[in-house]
UniProtKB/Swiss-Prot annotation:
List of residues binding GTP 1: 10-17, 57-61, 121-124
Pfam families per record: KH_dom-like, MMR_HSR1
Complex and partners: Associates with the 50S ribosomal subunit.
Family under the similarity heading: Belongs to the TRAFAC class TrmE-Era-EngA-EngB-Septin-like GTPase superfamily. EngA (Der) GTPase family.
Residue ranges of domain EngA-type G in the record: 4-169, 178-353
GO molecular function: GTP binding; ribosome binding
Binding site for GTP 2: 184-191, 231-235, 296-299
UniProt cross-references to CDD domains, sorted A to Z: EngA1, EngA2
Protein name: GTPase Der
Gene for this chain: der
Function (record text): GTPase that plays an essential role in the late steps of ribosome biogenesis.
Organism: Heliobacterium modesticaldum (strain ATCC 51547 / Ice1)
Length: 442
C-alpha cells in the first residue's frame, strides 16, 4: 500500500527544511551509503502514532530564475502540491508576517480539495497571539503556531496531520498480481513503452483508477498471469518556469515505486545515463524494490558488434549501486525485445520473494569465514555467529556478531556477493542488519 504524502509548501526562508527534519526525526535511510547513489534528501518517511507517511520538502529550492516573476513560480509550486500530496502544510514566517507571496500561495490552496494546515513558524512565545492571529486573514482556518527549530507544538501538528491522513486505499494485494512501476525522467519513452507492452497483450482486462488522482493503472493478463502497470506518464517537465516544480514530480515516482513489486527504470539509450536518472533509480533502490534497467530508443544508437558490451560497462559504472539489476536494450518504436521485458519482470519478482532456510544460510556463512576470514582490526577479528533471513521483498538478513564495529562495509559487500553467487537474488537489493551478540574480552 502506498504511504500518504504530506507536502511542506511555502516561500523561501520560512523554515521548511527545519520543519522537514523535525517531523521526520532527521532519519537517515536504512540502506548503507554506497558509491554511485546520487542522494536527494527531498523526502523521508515518518511515523507518528503508528501511522506511516512520506514527508516531501521543497526546502533548498531556489525559486528559480530571477528573471521569472516570483508569483508565477510560487503559483506552479502550490498547484503541484495540490495535485500530488494528500495533506499540505503551508508554512509561513511568524516573525516577518504576511507577505504578497504568502497571499499568492493561500489563494491557490483555498481551492484545494484536501486538508491544508496553515502553520506559523518561528513562534517561541505562544502568549504573543497577535504574531500569528493575523494569519487568519489568509482564509485557511486556524493558524497552528510552532517553532520548528525548538520542536515546540510540532507534536500537536503531527496529531492533526495523522487525524486526516487517508485510510488504507483498499488496493488489491493479490500475491499473484505483479504491480509494475514504469519510472524515469521526462521524455525517455515511458508512455510509448507502456503502450507498446499493452499493445502486445491479447487481453486488456480493465482500467483501474490509481491512488494518484489523474493516473490510470492498467491491468492485463499474459499466459495466465495478472499484471498491473502503474502509470507515471505525468512525470514530465512542462517548461523552464516550472524548474522548481519539477521536484514535485518525484512524488509521482515515489507513489508508483511504493506501490510496486517491480520497477522498470527507463533510460534513453541515445542520451546515456544522466544525474537525474541516477536520482530516480536511487529511489527504487532505497525502497528495496526489484528492478530492471530498460534502455529504450536502442534503435537510435549507431551500433557495431561491441556496442552493447560498451553500454553495459558504462551503465554498470554510472549505476554501480544497481549492479544487481538486469539490463535490457529495447525500442518501444520498433518493438525490439519487448516480449523479454515481462520475462524479466517475472524473474526478478520471483527472486524478490525467495526465502533461504537458516541452516543453508549458516552453512554458507561458515564456508565464507573459513575461505575468507574477516580482516583484523586492532588485533580483533569479526566473528559472525549466526545469520537468519527475516523478510522478503526485499530479502532481509540479520547477522549476529561478536562486535558490530568489526563488520566493515568491504566485508559486508564480500558476504553479499557470495550470497548472490549462491542463491541468486538477481534484480533485488538485499538488506543486512547487524546485531551484537557478545563483546569478547581481549
Amino acid at each position: 500500500m502506498a504511504k500518504p504524502i504530506v507536502a511542506i509548501v511555502g516561500r523561501p526562508n520560512v523554515g521548511k527544511s527545519t520543519l522537514f527534519n523535525r517531523l521526520t526525526g532527521g532519519r537517515v535511510a536504512i540502506v548503507e551509503d554506497q558509491p554511485g547513489v546520487t542522494r536527494d534528501r527531498l523526502y523521508r518517511d515518518a511515523n507518528w502514532l503508528d501511522r506511516e507517511f512520506t514527508v516531501v520538502d521543497t526546502g533548498g529550492l531556489d525559486f528559480g530564475d530571477r528573471e521569472n516573476p516570483f508569483s508565477a513560480i510560487i503559483h506552479k509550486q502550490a498547484e503541484a502540491a495540490m495535485e500530488e500530496a494528500d495533506v499540505i502544510l503551508f508554512l509561513v514566517d511568524g516573525r516577518s508576517g504576511i507577505t504578497a507571496d504568502d497571499e499568492a500561495v493561500a489563494a491557490i490552496l483555498r481551492k484545494a480539495k484536501k486538508p491544508v494546515f496553515l502553520v506559523v513558524n518561528k513562534i517561541e512565545d505562544f502568549s504573543q497571539r497577535e504574531r500569528y492571529f493575523d494569519f487568519y486573514s489568509l482564509g485557511l482556518g486556524e493558524p497552528i503556531p510552532i517553532s520548528a527549530s525548538h520542536g515546540m507544538n510540532t507534536g500537536d501538528l503531527l496529531d492533526a496531520v495523522v487525524a486526516v491522513l487517508p485510510e488504507n486505499n483498499g488496493e488489491d494485494d493479490d500475491p499473484d498480481t505483479i504491480k509494475i512501476a514504469v519510472i524515469g525522467r521526462p521524455n525517455v519513452g515511458k508512455s510509448s513503452l507502456v503502450n507498446a507492452i499493452l499493445g502486445q497483450e491479447r487481453v486488456i482486462v480493465s482500467d483501474i483508477p490509481g491512488t494518484t488522482r489523474d493516473a490510470i493503472d492498467t491491468a492485463f493478463d499474459r499466459d495466465g498471469k495478472r499484471y498491473i502497470l502503474i502509470d507515471t506518464a505525468g512525470m514530465r517537465r512542462k517548461g523552464r518556469i516550472e524548474e522548481a516544480v519539477e521536484r514535485y514530480s518525484v512524488m509521482r515516482s515515489l507513489r508508483a515505486i511504493d506501490r510496486s513489486d517491480v520497477v522498470l527504470m527507463v533510460i534513453d539509450a541515445s542520451q546515456g545515463v544522466t544525474e537525474q536518472d541516477k536520482k530516480i533509480a536511487g529511489y527504487a533502490h532505497e525502497a528495496g524494490k526489484a528492478c530492471v534497467l530498460v534502455l529504450n530508443k536502442w534503435d537510435l544508437v549507431p551500433k557495431d558488434d561491441k556496442t552493447m558490451s560498451r553500454f553495459d560497462k558504462v551503465v554498470r559504472s554510472e549505476m554501480s549501486f544497481l549492479a544487481y539489476a538486469p539490463t535490457i536494450y529495447v525500442s518501444a518504436l520498433t518493438k525490439q525485445r519487448l516480449p523479454k521485458i515481462l520475462e524479466l519482470v517475472d524473474f526478478v519478482a520471483e527472486q524478490a520473494t525467495r526465502r533461504i532456510s537458516t541452516s543453508v544460510l549458516n552453512e554458507l556463512l561458515a564456508d565464507i569465514q573459513r575461505v575468507t576470514p574477516a580482516p583484523t582490526d586492532r588485533g580483533r577479528r569479526l566473528k559472525i555467529l549466526f545469520v537468519t533471513q527475516t523478510a522478503v521483498k526485499p530479502p532481509t538478513f540479520v547477522f549476529f556478531v561478536n562486535d558490530e564495529d568489526l563488520f566493515h562495509f568491504s566485508y559486508r559487500r564480500h558476504v553479499e556477493n557470495r550470497f548472490r553467487e549462491t542463491f541468486g537474488f538477481e534484480g533485488v537489493p538485499m538488506r543486512f542488519f547487524i546485531r551484537e551478540r557478545e563483546k569478547e574480552k581481549d
